[in-house]
């Protein structure tokens, strides 16, 4: 079977691995925090402390990490060159995790066989975005979170956060990103300090 790896194995990444288990695949993951041994055994997962060690053996790499300074342009020319030749990237996280021009060059050279994703940078994508004319790509306009079940989950989460705020009680860690000016809860688990907001200025360079 194919070797499939996820960059990050939080709620979304782990759910992706669970969905792929029935398809006779070899599943891999890279994350700053290792999953519990019972989960690894349940899904027969191979953990990689180093991202590049996973990339060189995977036929498909799915990106499920947030955008922060450590992941901005994580997949650039150098990183993609370390991937298994002819591999595929699936990016449903954030567009700027992948260097758009590096991806296009890798498709053209054959280093990547294809690229699929639900996210662009900038977004919405301008008419001259290189991915619009790139061969072997499957792109959608950031619609993966618009299912009825996802919308219901968002609404329930917002309500719970507001109720905690007005009641003066602690917000659950899974909803917490920053507290007292510091990363906290899920934010401390998944993000790094710094700013990726320069992307907003970069986006103004594109034609509409």
Show where each model-derived region lies.
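C-terminal helix-to-coil terminal segments
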Residues: 121-208
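Conserved acidic E/D residue at the C-terminus of a beta-strand in Rossmann-like folds
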Residues: 29-31
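Glycine-rich NAD(P)-binding loop of Rossmann-like domains
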Residues: 1-15, 180
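Residues at the starts of beta-strands that form the adenosine-phosphate
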Residues: 3, 25-26
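Rossmann-like adenosine-cofactor binding region
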Residues: 34-130
């Amino acid at each position: 079977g194919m070797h499939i790896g996820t960059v990050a194995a939080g709620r979304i990444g782990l759910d992706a691995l669970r969905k792929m288990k029935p398809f006779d695949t070899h599943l891999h993951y890279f994350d700053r925090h290792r999953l519990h041994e019972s989960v690894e055994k349940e899904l027969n997962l191979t953990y990689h402390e180093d991202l590049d060690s996973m990339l060189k053996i995977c036929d498909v790499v799915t990106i499920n990490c947030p955008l922060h300074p450590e992941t901005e342009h994580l997949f650039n020319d150098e990183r993609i060159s370390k991937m298994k030749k002819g591999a595929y990237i699936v990016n449903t996280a954030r567009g700027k995790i992948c260097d758009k021009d590096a991806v296009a060059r890798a498709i053209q050279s054959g280093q990547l066989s294809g690229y699929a994703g639900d996210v662009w940078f900038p977004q919405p994508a301008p008419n001259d975005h290189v991915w619009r004319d790139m061969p072997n790509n499957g792109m959608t306009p950031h619609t993966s979170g618009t299912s009825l079940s996802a919308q219901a989950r968002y609404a329930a989460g917002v309500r719970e956060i507001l109720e905690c705020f007005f009641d003066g009680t602690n917000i659950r860690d899974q909803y917490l990103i920053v507290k007292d000016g510091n990363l906290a809860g899920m934010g401390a688990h998944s993000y790094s300090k710094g700013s990726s907001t320069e992307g907003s200025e970069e986006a103004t360079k594109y034609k509409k």
